[in-house]
Each structure stands twice: as structure tokens, then as C-alpha cells.
């Protein structure tokens, strides 16, 4: 038997999605094969400090992983002298939100010369920005909800004018979203001007730019995409899943996702006609390719109830891995077990790392 690969499981972080990361990390830790990998859990607290854990100390943590314990060891940083602070060949990031999904972490790991799971700097940065992702995803005629952008730098008068303009153009209700955040953090459904003003103020607490979009009446659809292990092969796309929200919030809010998930139904496979299913799969594969994604992504759509018209919602280049997260659930239903999915993602990461290592960087 070959020697286990040293693998860092990185979780936590300075982000509004910190708690989600702890839950995802517990699920990944549970499904990683300890005979294949020597797992080194490293947590990042909300102040940005790193803490190393012993794998065996966390095995009993089934719901979420701790950030600091009596047995954890503080690290001076993730890197020391430009290299990873621990002896590991690959990093599996299970961190969400700005700094972690937007290319910053990916760039840091590339500078350190270490392999990492998931999308690279470019695709992570594009995918994290809802505006930029939509611009590229919709270049060939695919639609998204109409929206307008508002900057944190807008003064009170400009914000008020913006709110009146979007309400006049799009009507009610409206959705307010931070441009570069996930897990429905900072997202609000506004049914009137008072709610819109409050939603805008709250969303701007989380991001420098927000978008306000029209409400699309329709079904909420998600697909998981996995890079092909065959070089230049087409991305693999899972069967189609649907989210049905029965929560009082009226949409797939943070509360509906994680705190009161029993009021949300994840339907796999979604009940769609064959033509619509194929259109969605092709759209998901195309978007994965347009954004030059690597490893994995989850692509979300809305489908109009009456016309069956497809609207791109967003792409998540570092999707959740909790026990209720759609990405692993979709692949399990499609035929790839959770541990096998993790193995595939790690193998893909090693392939990309090996490619980068063979690039010429000396021009003399």
C-alpha cells in the first residue's frame, strides 16, 4: 500500500459564512479515507489566526468542527517563509466567502507552490462576483434576472434615488444581494420601499457592491458540475436537483438553508421533461467552460413555471459540503459516492498542480 498523502483540511475563516464552513468541514473529514490521506485539520478563527488540530481529536465531532480546543496548536500563519507551515502536499479548502472563494486563497496557495482542490484564481474571482459571472455566463443568449448595481460609496441621496429607480423599473418584490457573498448571507426579499431601504443598508454591511434584482416566478434548480478526468473532456454534469422552500422567509434564505432546513425540500431528481433537463445540463456545462472552471462548481438556475424559460442565477466554485448540501447529494444520486467524489477532486487538483510545476518560469 502506498504511503498516505499529507492533506490539509482548511476550514473556518474571517467571513459571514464561517459557521457553514465548520459544518462542511465535519462532513468532509468524515468521508475522507484516512488510509489514503494523512489529514491535517487547520482552522482559521474569525480574527484570522490559524490553529492546527490532530485528526484523531476531531473524529467525534459529527456536526461541526471546532476552531480552537485545549489540544489545538496555534500557528504563526498558514505560510512560513513563503511555504506551507505544515508538511503537506495538498490543501482541501472548505472555506467560504470573500478571501476564500474569490481567488485570494487560491493565489496564496499557488505562490506557496502547493496543490489545492477546486477552481483556480481566475475562475474563483469571476464566479464569486455575481455581476461578472452573469456577464460571461449569458454571452450566448442565456438570460438572468434583470438587476442593477449599487456601490458602498454611494451617498444617502444616491442610495435613495437608486431604490426608487429599481422599484419603478422592476416592481415588487425585489431581491437584494451582496455581489460577492454566498450561503444567502445578507440577502433579503423586499416587498415595499421601507423593506428595500433596510435591505440595502444591511447588504452593504457585507460587501462593497450589491445588486438588486427582479423577482423571477419559477422553480429553483441546481446542478453539480465536475471537471472531466480525461484531458480536454467535456465537464461532467449531475442529474438535476430542485429546491422547494416552505419556509416563512419565502425564499432559500440562510435560515431556511441551515437553521430550519426541515422546511425546505431538496428534490433529486427534479421532475422535468427531457428537453428541459438537457437544456439545463448543457447550460451548466457551458457556464463551467465559459468561466474556465477547474475541479468543481454548482450552477444554479430559475425556470419559469409557465414558459419553461431558463434564467442563470449564480455559480458557486466552492460549494458547501454539509450533509444537506446539494453538491455532494447530487453526485451521490448520479452515482458518485461522497468518498469517491473527494478522491476525484483531489486527483484533479494534483493534475493541475503538476501542470503548473512543469511550466517554464525562467526566461534566461
Swiss-Prot record:
<keyword id="KW-0133">Cell shape</keyword>
<dbReference type="GO" id="GO:0005829">
    <property type="term" value="C:cytosol"/>
</dbReference>
<keyword id="KW-0436">Ligase</keyword>
<comment type="pathway">
    <text>Cell wall biogenesis; peptidoglycan biosynthesis.</text>
</comment>
<dbReference type="GO" id="GO:0008716">
    <property type="term" value="F:D-alanine-D-alanine ligase activity"/>
</dbReference>
<keyword id="KW-0961">Cell wall biogenesis/degradation</keyword>
<dbReference type="InterPro" id="IPR011127">
    <property type="entry name" value="Dala_Dala_lig_N"/>
</dbReference>
<keyword id="KW-0067">ATP-binding</keyword>
<dbReference type="InterPro" id="IPR011095">
    <property type="entry name" value="Dala_Dala_lig_C"/>
</dbReference>
<keyword id="KW-0479">Metal-binding</keyword>
<feature type="binding site">
    <location>
        <position position="314"/>
    </location>
    <ligand>
        <name>Mg(2+) 1</name>
    </ligand>
</feature>
<dbReference type="InterPro" id="IPR005905">
    <property type="entry name" value="D_ala_D_ala"/>
</dbReference>
<dbReference type="GO" id="GO:0009252">
    <property type="term" value="P:peptidoglycan biosynthetic process"/>
</dbReference>
<dbReference type="GO" id="GO:0005524">
    <property type="term" value="F:ATP binding"/>
</dbReference>
<feature type="binding site">
    <location>
        <position position="316"/>
    </location>
    <ligand>
        <name>Mg(2+) 2</name>
    </ligand>
</feature>
<protein>
    <recommendedName>
        <fullName>D-alanine--D-alanine ligase</fullName>
        <ecNumber>6.3.2.4</ecNumber>
    </recommendedName>
</protein>
<feature type="binding site">
    <location>
        <position position="300"/>
    </location>
    <ligand>
        <name>Mg(2+) 1</name>
    </ligand>
</feature>
<comment type="function">
    <text>Cell wall formation.</text>
</comment>
<feature type="binding site">
    <location>
        <position position="314"/>
    </location>
    <ligand>
        <name>Mg(2+) 2</name>
    </ligand>
</feature>
<keyword id="KW-0547">Nucleotide-binding</keyword>
<comment type="similarity">
    <text>Belongs to the D-alanine--D-alanine ligase family.</text>
</comment>
<feature type="binding site">
    <location>
        <begin position="167"/>
        <end position="222"/>
    </location>
    <ligand>
        <name>ATP</name>
    </ligand>
</feature>
<dbReference type="InterPro" id="IPR013815">
    <property type="entry name" value="ATP_grasp_subdomain_1"/>
</dbReference>
<dbReference type="Pfam" id="PF01820">
    <property type="entry name" value="Dala_Dala_lig_N"/>
</dbReference>
<dbReference type="InterPro" id="IPR011761">
    <property type="entry name" value="ATP-grasp"/>
</dbReference>
<dbReference type="GO" id="GO:0008360">
    <property type="term" value="P:regulation of cell shape"/>
</dbReference>
<keyword id="KW-0460">Magnesium</keyword>
<dbReference type="GO" id="GO:0046872">
    <property type="term" value="F:metal ion binding"/>
</dbReference>
<feature type="domain" description="ATP-grasp">
    <location>
        <begin position="134"/>
        <end position="347"/>
    </location>
</feature>
<keyword id="KW-0963">Cytoplasm</keyword>
<keyword id="KW-0573">Peptidoglycan synthesis</keyword>
<dbReference type="Pfam" id="PF07478">
    <property type="entry name" value="Dala_Dala_lig_C"/>
</dbReference>
<keyword id="KW-0464">Manganese</keyword>
<dbReference type="InterPro" id="IPR016185">
    <property type="entry name" value="PreATP-grasp_dom_sf"/>
</dbReference>
<dbReference type="InterPro" id="IPR000291">
    <property type="entry name" value="D-Ala_lig_Van_CS"/>
</dbReference>
<dbReference type="GO" id="GO:0071555">
    <property type="term" value="P:cell wall organization"/>
</dbReference>
Amino acid at each position: 500500500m502506498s504511503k498516505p498523502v499529507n492533506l490539509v483540511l482548511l476550514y473556518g475563516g474571517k467571513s459571514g459564512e464561517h459557521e457553514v464552513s465548520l459544518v462542511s468541514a465535519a462532513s468532509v473529514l468524515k468521508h475522507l479515507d484516512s488510509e489514503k490521506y494523512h489529514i491535517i485539520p487547520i482552522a482559521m478563527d474569525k480574527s484570522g489566526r490559524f490553529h492546527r488540530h490532530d485528526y484523531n481529536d476531531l473524529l467525534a465531532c459529527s456536526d461541526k468542527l471546532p476552531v480552537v480546543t485545549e489540544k489545538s496548536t496555534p500557528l504563526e500563519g498558514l505560510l512560513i517563509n513563503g511555504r506551507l507551515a505544515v508538511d503537506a502536499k495538498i490543501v482541501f479548502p472548505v472555506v467560504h466567502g470573500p478571501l476564500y472563494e474569490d481567488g485570494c486563497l487560491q493565489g496564496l496557495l499557488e505562490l506557496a507552490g502547493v496543490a489545492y482542490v477546486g477552481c483556480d484564481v481566475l475562475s474563483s474571482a469571476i464566479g464569486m462576483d455575481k455581476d461578472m459571472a452573469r456577464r460571461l455566463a449569458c454571452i450566448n443568449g442565456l438570460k438572468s434576472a434583470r438587476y442593477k448595481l449599487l456601490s458602498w460609496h454611494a451617498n444617502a441621496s444616491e442610495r435613495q434615488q437608486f431604490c426608487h429607480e429599481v422599484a419603478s423599473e422592476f416592481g415588487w418584490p425585489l431581491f437584494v444581494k451582496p455581489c460577492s457573498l454566498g450561503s444567502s448571507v445578507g440577502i433579503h426579499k423586499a416587498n415595499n420601499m421601507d423593506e428595500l431601504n433596510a435591505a440595502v443598508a444591511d447588504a452593504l454591511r457585507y460587501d462593497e457592491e450589491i445588486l438588486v434584482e427582479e423577482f423571477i416566478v419559477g422553480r429553483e434548480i441546481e446542478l453539480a458540475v465536475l471537471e472531466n478526468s480525461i484531458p480536454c473532456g467535456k465537464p461532467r454534469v449531475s442529474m438535476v436537483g430542485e429546491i422547494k422552500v416552505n419556509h416563512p422567509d419565502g425564499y432559500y434564505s440562510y435560515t431556511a438553508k441551515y437553521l430550519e432546513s426541515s422546511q425546505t425540500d431538496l428534490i433529486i431528481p427534479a421532475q422535468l421533461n427531457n428537453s428541459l433537463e438537457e437544456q439545463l445540463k448543457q447550460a451548466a456545462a457551458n457556464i463551467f467552460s465559459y468561466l474556465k472552471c477547474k475541479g468543481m462548481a454548482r450552477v444554479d438556475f430559475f425556470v419559469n413555471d409557465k414558459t419553461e424559460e431558463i434564467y442563470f442565477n449564480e455559480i458557486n466554485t466552492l460549494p458547501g459540503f454539509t450533509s444537506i448540501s446539494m453538491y455532494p447529494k447530487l453526485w451521490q444520486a448520479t452515482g458518485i459516492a461522497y468518498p469517491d467524489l473527494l478522491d476525484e477532486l483531489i486527483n484533479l487538483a494534483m493534475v493541475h498542480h503538476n501542470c503548473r510545476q512543469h511550466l517554464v518560469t525562467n526566461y534566461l
